[in-house]
Structures are given as structure tokens and as C-alpha cells.
Amino acid sequence: MKLIFAGGGTGGHVFPAIAIAQEILRTQQNAEIQFVGTERGIEATAVPKQGFPMHLIPVAGVKRGFSPKELFENLKVPMRLQRSLSACHDILQREKPNVVIGTGGFVSGPIVWEAQSKKIPTLIQEQNSMPGVTTRLLSLRASEVHLSFEESKTYIRRTNGVFVTGNPTRQFQSHRPAQAKAFFSLDSTRKTLLVFGGSLGARSINQAIESNLEEWLEKFNLIWQTGKLDFADIATRIGSRKNLWYNAFIDQMDMAYAAADLAVCRAGASTLAEITHLGKPSVLVPYPYAAANHQFYNAKSLADNHAALLIENKDIGLETSKTEIMSLLQNESRLKQMSENSLKLGKPHATRIIAEHVIRLAELG
């Protein structure tokens, strides 16, 4: 069995692909798995680290700005697309995969499109509530389309072969809250707020936390991933504090989730898959510049199901937002209800189910 995965640009597209690939290898040790990506996306480093071979293509997405540099880069897009289609044609001719799997991002477009043109089975996995342009186009000819949200069906112009499977996510070890709080040297009797905004961080969230730090620490424990861009400056200003653990990155995310009574974070698809898998109540602050504002719609899906509180990026620094979060963190019954609602939305078996569908497509040919 030979499979080709394509998805990249951001971790939200790459890591689901890696999770599916690893699950397939767990049951199909002889499967040959390759990836297609770009040298500028996170996949260029993340995929080889997992031991998978990588084909690089020159495709690039359309820039949404209007600066001279961005306009110039957009002029190159058609040429890069044509070169990428040609490269993907050659890859498919040479490798002859049984199935091609696309997990989103512009990089998945050329290889999945070429595979469909050659009648090679294709499977699309979409992470976001509002599917991107690439997914909508490729879904028309895909063998199967796997979605993470029920409401995503309204954007897919077909009903057969469409499944709401959930978003593949990494697996976490289970820990008792007291054990996890002790890991971060925090008071086991206090409510704990977990704040994170990705590897780079989220400046608006960081500023909202730091501006009221004394008040947060007076009442709660705080586990705070600042991201690497703001960490040095924040560390210089605040030093070490009681009831506070902070760093640029959280390596032991399983411990952080276990310690947390409430999470404040962005609304990327992978993050939401993790918090619903674990049944964590959350305050979601969508990144306002995400493509097609997809983080807002991701967050709205949880908020509409009373599993999360949605606060827009422009409002996270307001006094009313701080008061609302603090009130929520002290409301045990509401946290419990949100946790139950979050867990209902979780799809912990997504990785296994999608892997099984890929294997079946490969066997059917």
C-alpha cells in the first residue's frame, strides 16, 4: 500500500496528516507513506522529523494584502501553480499511490487535483468549521470528504461520501488535577487558568493577562504560554511570582490541560479538537486575520453549543471581558456544564476512523 499525504503551511493542516499517517502505520506496518509540501511551510521540518519522505513543490497561496511586495508575489502564483501541477503529475506517474490524502492548505491543491484527474482515489480532511476554497473545490471530485463540524456540510456541494468524523489530534496521557498542578508547583486547592496562543503567542491575550496580573494571581493559579515573541519582554517585567507558571512554550501540554479548570486560547481547529476531546471549558479569542475568518466560525460552533465563551480579539483587553472570565472561573456549576457540552462535541476516535477509511479506499482501488 502506497499513500501520499498533502497538507501544510500551518500546523493545523500538517499535524492531522501526520496523526493519520502514524495511525495507518500502527496497523499497516508495510504501508509506504510519503508527503508533498513546500519548503516554506511548517511541513518542511515537521514531516521529516517523523521519518516520512517529502516531495517539495513550488506552489504558493494568494497574499491578501495590497503592499507592492504582496502584489508582486501574487503575480508569481499562476506560474508556480503550473509548475506544481507538472511536478505533481511526475510524482504520481513515478510513485503510483493507491490513495492521495489532502488535509488542507494551498499545498494540497495540485497533488489532489492531479490525482483526481488520473482517477486515483482521494480523501479530503477539513479541520475548520468553514471549509477553505481548496477544500470546496477538491471536494467535488474526492472519493470521500471528512469534516470536523456538522455545520460544514452546508459548504460542501454533495452529500454522498461526506462524513463528520472530527479532527485528528495528538493523544494525551491522563493525569489527576492535583498531580498536574503539583507538576507546575501550583496550589492544588486553587482554580487554575490555562492561557496559550500558539508557538508565537497571541499579543492581545498576553497584554490582557499582564495588565491585570496581580488580580489574576490573587484569586487563581495561572499557567501561561506567552509564545516566543513576547516571552523575553514579559519575563523582564514580571520576574517570578507565586501561583504563576509561565514560559514561551509548554512542552507537557497533557499536564497543562489536566491542571486547567478553564482555558483561554485561540480557536484553531487543532486546539478545539484537543479541548473538546478532553472536555475542557474554554474562552475562545479567534485570531482576526485567519483566512476567511475561519477561527471565528470555529469558536462560534462551540459557543453556540454552550461549550465555550467567545470573546473577539478587539474585546479581550476590556474590563468587562476580564470580569466575565473571572466570574466564569468561580462558577463551578457553569464550568461543569460547559465541560459536559465540550465533551459531547469531541470526537476522540477521529484519527482511527479516518485511517480506516484510507485503508479501505486503498484496498478497493
Swiss-Prot record:
Chain sites annotated for binding UDP-N-acetyl-alpha-D-glucosamine: 10-12, 128, 170, 199, 250, 295
Which cysteines link up through disulfide bonds?
Answer: none
Q: Which domain of life is it from?
A: Bacteria
Q: What is its EC number?
A: 2.4.1.227
As recorded in UniProt, coiled-coil segments are none
BP-aspect Gene Ontology terms: carbohydrate metabolic process; cell division; cell wall organization; lipid glycosylation; peptidoglycan biosynthetic process; regulation of cell shape
Keyword hit for Repressor = no
> InterPro entries, per this entry?
GlcNAc_MurG, Glyco_trans_28_C, GlycoTrans_28_N
What GO cellular component term, any one, is given? Answer: plasma membrane
Catalyzed reaction equations: di-trans,octa-cis-undecaprenyl diphospho-N-acetyl-alpha-D-muramoyl-L-alanyl-D-glutamyl-meso-2,6-diaminopimeloyl-D-alanyl-D-alanine + UDP-N-acetyl-alpha-D-glucosamine = di-trans,octa-cis-undecaprenyl diphospho-[N-acetyl-alpha-D-glucosaminyl-(1->4)]-N-acetyl-alpha-D-muramoyl-L-alanyl-D-glutamyl-meso-2,6-diaminopimeloyl-D-alanyl-D-alanine + UDP + H(+)
Tell me where in or outside the cell this protein is found. Cell inner membrane
Q: Tell me the GO molecular function terms.
A: UDP-N-acetyl-D-glucosamine:N-acetylmuramoyl-L-alanyl-D-glutamyl-meso-2,6-diaminopimelyl-D-alanyl-D-alanine-diphosphoundecaprenol 4-beta-N-acetylglucosaminlytransferase activity; undecaprenyldiphospho-muramoylpentapeptide beta-N-acetylglucosaminyltransferase activity
Instruction: List the SUPFAM superfamilies hit by this protein, alphabetically.
Output: UDP-Glycosyltransferase/glycogen phosphorylase (SSF53756)
Name the pathway. Cell wall biogenesis; peptidoglycan biosynthesis
Q: How does it sit in the membrane?
A: Peripheral membrane protein
Similarity annotation: Belongs to the glycosyltransferase 28 family. MurG subfamily.
Query: Entry's HAMAP family?
Result: MurG
Q: Can you name this protein?
A: UDP-N-acetylglucosamine--N-acetylmuramyl-(pentapeptide) pyrophosphoryl-undecaprenol N-acetylglucosamine transferase
**What organism does the UniProt record list as the source?**
Chloroherpeton thalassium (strain ATCC 35110 / GB-78)
